[in-house]
């Protein structure tokens, strides 16, 4: 699995108007929750984090991922291609998936379902909750990924031959966060431990602040949620 990650200082600019500097901390927590879910998905052999952010790189290694250095101001599709090349260099050719790193409500069982369904298609994708963007892109080989992330990427991936995998619009794998409205939507459904801890730390008034998604509660102390969130806010 390839997970491209922007530098936290540059990420989630559309959240800045409503949330100010908190957006940087949120981007950090989103990444950690997404990575945790990916690492705990059955069938995922290798995770490659593509990033120029030193904190993201350090924490990715701590959580068992490989790290591929990225350009300081990366293009998302270039980052995905870099990650796919890294996958080819460290293991046998095989299925690959690229995910956006802003899925704080992602559940391992959702990703497992998608990866299982993707085995039946040369290329496949999951649209975001709007039906316009893409949160997951898969291919049976690393060289076949052909990413086209960006505006209207769901249409572009379809036009390039990728099969759309149908998932409920309110499941975590489709709930990427770009706007305050997106944040409220995923918070109502439930977020992972890092984002939940940040909500508590910031006393954010979201229902998920005291109610992380099912399956995440048991890992909070083991993964050092509080210290990770404190690092994000420092």
State the predicted function of each range:
Residues 100-104:
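The conserved acidic donor/metal-binding loop of glycosyltransferases
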Residues 106-131:
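Conserved donor-nucleotide/metal-binding helix-loop-beta segment in metal-dependent transferases, i.e.
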Residues 61-95, 153:
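Short phosphate-binding loop-to-helix
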Residues 1-15:
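N-terminal nucleotide-binding beta1-loop-alpha1 segment
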Residues 135-162:
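Short, glycine-/small-residue-rich phosphate/pyrophosphate-handling segment
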Residues 152-218, 228-234:
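Conserved alpha/beta core of the MobA/IspD/sugar-nucleotide pyrophosphorylase nucleotidyltransferase superfamily
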Residues 44-66:
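Acidic donor-binding segment of Leloir-type glycosyltransferases
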Residues 27-44:
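A short, N-terminal amphipathic alpha-helix
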